């Protein structure tokens, strides 16, 4: 107990000496954080041994000491990495290397030279908010190389430059929705207006594609700068398009004219083929019915002609001719004659009934009906049964998706009458993705953890990658990683199950192909 108190007091003395010396070297700041790391380690050990107080200092719970020790270790690693860069010999104060400064926006970067930026919303001086713009921002790229960038402010927000890319860490439009009602704000730096009241706008989404001419450097001039009328008109005219873009941010991408024309041609061809098939089927049915009717009417006519011919020769209606010149009386007395006549009468009745049915069926087919008696008589030439037609249509609807059709659908997939498999195949034509942005090691940890804990909730992961400037090889922004899915339902389940680490941003999208 006494030994722990003595060690704790010794650490307090070392910290007081560092604060009094106030050295502005990077080595002194590393020593400061190494001393701060020892303090929570000592308190953690004391709590583990059941000690609740060291002198006048209460011992916190182990979780608090563990968190502070980890923060100190992380700051030591960051400062030691900065010491190997070209900026190690610059003056560094306790404020520049504090955990509060390191965590302020932009988070995870060392910063110097704070400048106040005042933004007035709705032209109301009482409705104002203060922001901090840093003169210099020190950031590390994906290759663990440190860079020094200047900050600036425009009507969109506060940013720092990564090559030619403006990385915004404060957006005024977000707070305009929170604090204002008209969506207008005025930007002041050091109590001087640098941007007159402007309306809501958003920064362009493509890296390096922000062509804002109205920008202010970190150190403002004494002259008052305002947005000219031309740029203000451009901002106002672009506002509906930008609003529409934000509305479609997580939807499907707008289709090009060529893709739209190709889709319309495919649809018109499919409609033409379906119409031609239906016409050919109706023609074949009508032709078959008519030919059947003609044959039956011809047979009936021949039968009636034979009957009338026999009557004209003086035979009774019930007699029939079996051949030769035998007399009718002899034939009528023979037992085979009656059966033959009966057979002939039954054939004649069947012919008449079939002719009547054929005529009705032909009338039904001419009237547009595909069912009823006419359909039963023309089964060989008519279309298949409804059950067979449903199965055949279902197989055509649930066929596989070829590589050329992936991403070809420009419509939202309907959930009606397709089934689970049909919906998956339809959504395969426009596979959904999630793009995550953050530190490279953090994204790799997300990928490895998802492969262990969330297997089956995604399709595949990409490696970490970055945008590259168009006029050089410098990497722009934070590293990215793509996560692909088989369907929008799978993406939703993945997004609900996964908890992204702090500092990782996500966005939804879809691709024509993977």
Curated annotation (Swiss-Prot):
Belongs to the papillomaviridae E2 protein family. One of its GO terms (biological process) is viral DNA genome replication. There is a cross-link at residue 437 (Glycyl lysine isopeptide (Lys-Gly) (interchain with G-Cter in SUMO)). Binds DNA as homodimer. Interacts with protein E1; this interaction greatly increases E1 DNA-binding activity. Interacts with protein L1; this interaction enhances E2-dependent replication and transcription activation. Interacts with protein L2; this interaction inhibits E2 transcriptional activity but not DNA replication function E2. Interacts with protein E7; this interaction inhibits E7 oncogenic activity. Interacts with host TAF1; this interaction modulates E2-dependent transcriptional regulation. Interacts with host BRD4; this interaction mediates E2 transcriptional activation function. Residues 199-231, 285-321, 334-346 have a biased composition (Low complexity). Residues 1-201 are annotated as: Transactivation domain. Transmembrane segments: none annotated. Its main location: host cell. Residues 197-424 are annotated as: Disordered. Residues 232-244 have a biased composition (Polar residues). It comes from the Viruses. GO terms for molecular function: DNA binding; DNA-binding transcription factor activity; nucleotide binding. This is Regulatory protein E2. The gene is E2. Residues 248-284, 323-333 have a biased composition (Basic residues). Phosphorylated. Sumoylation plays a regulatory role in E2 transcriptional activity. InterPro entries: E2/EBNA1_C_sf, Nucleotide-bd_a/b_plait_sf, Papillomavirus_E2_C, PPV_E2_N, Reg_prot_E2, Regulatory_protein_E2_N, Regulatory_protein_E2_N_1, Regulatory_protein_E2_N_2.
């Amino acid at each position: 107990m006494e030994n722990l108190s003595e060690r704790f007091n010794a650490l307090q003395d070392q910290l007081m000496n560092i604060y009094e010396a106030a050295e502005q070297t990077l080595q002194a700041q590393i020593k400061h954080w190494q001393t701060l790391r020892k303090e929570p380690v000592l308190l953690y050990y004391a709590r583990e041994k059941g000690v609740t107080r060291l002198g006048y200092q209460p011992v916190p719970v182990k979780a608090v000491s563990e968190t502070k020790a980890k923060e100190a270790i992380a700051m030591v690693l960051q400062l030691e990495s900065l010491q190997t860069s070209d900026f190690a010999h610059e003056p560094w104060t306790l404020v520049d290397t504090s955990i509060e400064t390191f965590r302020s926006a932009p988070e995870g970067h060392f910063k110097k030279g704070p400048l106040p930026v005042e933004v007035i919303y709705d032209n109301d001086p009482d409705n104002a908010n203060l922001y901090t713009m840093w003169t210099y921002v020190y950031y590390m790229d994906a290759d663990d190389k440190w860079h020094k960038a200047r900050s600036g402010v425009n009507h969109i927000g506060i940013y720092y430059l990564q090559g030619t890319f403006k990385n915004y860490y404060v957006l005024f439009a977000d707070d305009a929705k929170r604090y204002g009602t008209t969506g207008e704000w005025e930007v002041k730096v050091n109590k001087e207006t640098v941007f007159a009241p402007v309306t809501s706008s958003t920064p362009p989404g493509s890296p390096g594609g922000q062509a804002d001419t109205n920008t202010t450097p970190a150190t403002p001039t004494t002259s008052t700068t305002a947005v000219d009328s031309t740029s203000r008109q451009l901002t106002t005219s672009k506002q509906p398009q930008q609003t529409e873009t934000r509305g479609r941010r997580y939807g499907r991408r707008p289709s090009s004219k060529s893709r739209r024309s190709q889709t319309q041609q495919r649809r018109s061809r499919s409609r033409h083929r379906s119409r031609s098939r239906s016409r050919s089927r109706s023609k074949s049915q009508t032709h078959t019915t008519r030919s059947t009717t003609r044959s039956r009417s011809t047979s009936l006519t021949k039968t009636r002609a034979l009957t009338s011919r026999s009557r004209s020769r003086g035979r009774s209606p019930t007699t029939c001719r079996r051949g030769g010149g035998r007399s009718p009386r002899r034939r009528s007395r023979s037992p085979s004659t009656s059966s033959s006549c009966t057979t002939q009468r039954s054939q004649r009745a069947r012919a008449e009934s079939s002719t009547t049915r054929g005529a009705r069926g032909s009338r039904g087919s001419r009237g547009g009906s595909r069912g009823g008696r006419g359909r039963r008589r023309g089964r060989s030439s008519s279309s298949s049964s409804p059950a067979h037609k449903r199965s055949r249509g279902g197989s055509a609807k649930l066929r596989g998706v070829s590589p050329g059709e992936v991403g070809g659908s420009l419509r939202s997939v309907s959930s009606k009458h397709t089934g689970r498999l049909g919906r998956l195949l339809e959504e395969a034509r426009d596979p959904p993705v999630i793009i995550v942005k953050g530190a490279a090691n953090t994204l790799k940890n997300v990928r490895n953890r998802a492969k262990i804990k969330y297997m089956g909730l995604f399709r595949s992961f990409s490696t970490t990658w970055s945008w590259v400037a168009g006029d050089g090889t410098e990497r722009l922004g934070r590293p990215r990683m793509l996560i692909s899915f088989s369907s929008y339902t799978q993406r939703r389940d993945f997004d609900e199950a996964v908890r992204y680490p702090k500092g990782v941003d996500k966005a939804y999208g879809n691709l024509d192909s993977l």
